[in-house]
Amino acid sequence: MNARENPFATDRTQRILTFRPEWANTSMSELTAQWEKLNRRAEILGRHDSGKSTLLTSWEQWLAENNQPVIHIFLNREHRNISDSQWQQLTESQGKIILLDGEEQLSWRQRRKFYQLSTNAHGLLITRHKSGSLPTLCNLDPNIQILHHCIKEVSPENYQELAPHLPEWWKKYQGNIREILLECYDAMK
């Protein structure tokens, strides 16, 4: 099978695997109601590749559908700093929702500046690996059942072939679903 036909190609899995609240035993209406109770300032917790960014992307789509202006900032190990243009956007955050993916990447000084600038925002939702200064909206903890859902969603026709390997891969990659999807890609070559 060539790369273009592989059902587990990264661009395809990212397109297909959007956040499914029911897989986390919740609903979007429950999450939004909880966010409102937390005064629209909360954090999404979870280990690396647990679905935090996927949830944040779904949240951004939901906000866009409801005509809510958004400032979305993505940080990771390779990109740890907020850019000058993003800092400028944050100075104009009143009435906007700020989504910060990877808050723990910021230095103490940057974090302090970020929270000062986000005070007047209409809402704030961040992702972290461990609890920080905001109340927790949800803690994503993937399990092997979610992995099975993902495989069935991406490639139902290959599920029976891949299913026997999933427990082994789950252990090998310590529950990192993204890495297991790459393993599925290799298995389909």
Question: Can you say where each PLM-predicted feature lies in the sequence?
Answer:
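Conserved P-loop NTPase "ATPase switch" module shared by AAA+ and STAND
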Residues: 73-77, 87-111
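Conserved small helical "lid"/interfacial subdomain of P-loop NTPases
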Residues: 138-167
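Amphipathic alpha-helical "lid/sensor" segments that cap RecA-like P-loop NTPase cores
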Residues: 162-189
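Walker A/P-loop nucleotide-binding motif
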Residues: 38-58
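A short, basic N-terminal segment
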Residues: 1-39, 183-189
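Active-site signature of alpha/beta-hydrolase-fold catalytic machinery across serine-
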Residues: 58, 62, 183
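Conserved catalytic segments around the Walker B and adjacent sensor/switch elements
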Residues: 63-79
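Sensor-1/coupling segment of RecA-like P-loop NTPase cores
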Residues: 104-143
